[in-house]
Each structure stands twice: as C-alpha cells, then as structure tokens.
Swiss-Prot record:
Keyword annotations from UniProtKB, A to Z: Calcium, Cytoplasm, Cytoskeleton, Metal-binding, Repeat
EF-hand domain sequence ranges: 9-44, 45-80, 82-117, 118-150
Localization, UniProt: Cytoplasm, Cytoskeleton, Microtubule organizing center, Spindle pole body
A Gene Ontology term for the protein's cellular component: growing cell tip
Molecular functions (GO terms): calcium ion binding; enzyme regulator activity
Family per similarity comment: Belongs to the calmodulin family.
Organism: Schizosaccharomyces pombe (strain 972 / ATCC 24843)
Single GO BP term: spindle pole body organization
Listed name of the protein: Calmodulin
Gene (UniProt): cam1
Positions of Ca(2+) 1 binding: D22, D24, D26, N28, E33
C-alpha cells in the first residue's frame, strides 16, 4: 500500500496521531518524541531501536520523521496488517474444525478439494517440514512462517 491509496479520512486520522507524537509541534518527530509516545503505550524501546524505526522511513536523512514520512510508515503498517489478515483467513480454510491446528487429515482434505493427488506420506512430509515444534500438527505461527517464506 502506498500513501496514494490512503483515504482522506485515514490521512486526517494520521495527521491527528502525528500531532500527538510531535510534542513540540515543529513538524518533525524525533527519536525522543517517538520514545515518549511508545513508553506511554507500554513499550520500552532502546534508543537504538527508536533510531532504527526513524531510519526506516527517514527519506530525507535528517534524523526525524516529517508528516509525509509518517504517512509512508503508516501505509506500510496497514499493508502488513492486510497481509496478516489474509494469512489468518488462509489458515482458517485449512483448519476445518477451528481448533487452531492443521492436521494431516485437514491438509489432505483441502489439497484433494484443490485437485492435488498426494499420498498420505507426501502430506505427512509437508506437515513435518512445517512442524517446527514437532507436535505432529501445524499451528498458526508455523503456518504463517511457511507462507511468509514463499
């Protein structure tokens, strides 16, 4: 998502949020201002982490975030959230009984309905490959890791 895809309403909300971060109202968010807001939200980032967050979007290299850079950051975060929702929806397709795990049977059922003809052993191999904790099923974190690595 780019800043062009943001609605006027979203931009207005982000301007309001920006002014909360920009405590001295100089049009820029410093690492100190970012730290104050994050600590008020229960986070405890280090000075280096705060600077890294700023550097990620600091297009002009001045060490602070202006409103345009802030919009870029928020648009990226929204895109990440959209991707997360898509992965959750995909997980639900596989997790037929909704118990939070994908079993060999559930994976076989979905693959068969998609026209894939795999043996139980091939499906079990797929589960084993994704099953990092070795419990014989795929939980959401394991599923997300496999999907995100593609």
């Amino acid at each position: 998502m780019t800043t062009r895809n943001l609605t006027d309403e979203q931009i207005a909300e982000f301007r309001e949020a920006f002014s909360l971060f920009d405590r001295d109202q100089d049009g820029n968010i410093t690492s100190n201002e970012l730290g104050v807001v994050m600590r008020s939200l229960g986070q405890s980032p280090t000075a280096a982490e705060l600077q890294d967050m700023i550097n990620e979007v600091d297009a002009d290299g001045n060490g602070t975030i202006d409103f345009t850079e802030f919009l870029t950051m928020m648009a990226r975060k929204m895109k990440d959230t959209d991707n997360e929702e898509e992965v959750r929806e995909a997980f639900k397709v596989f997790d037929k009984d909704g118990n939070g795990y994908i079993t060999v049977e559930e994976l076989t059922h979905v693959l068969t309905s998609l026209g894939e003809r795999l043996s139980q052993e091939e499906v079990a191999d797929m589960i084993r490959e994704a099953d990092t904790d070795g419990d014989g099923v795929i939980n959401y974190e394991e599923f997300s890791r496999v999907i995100s690595s593609k």
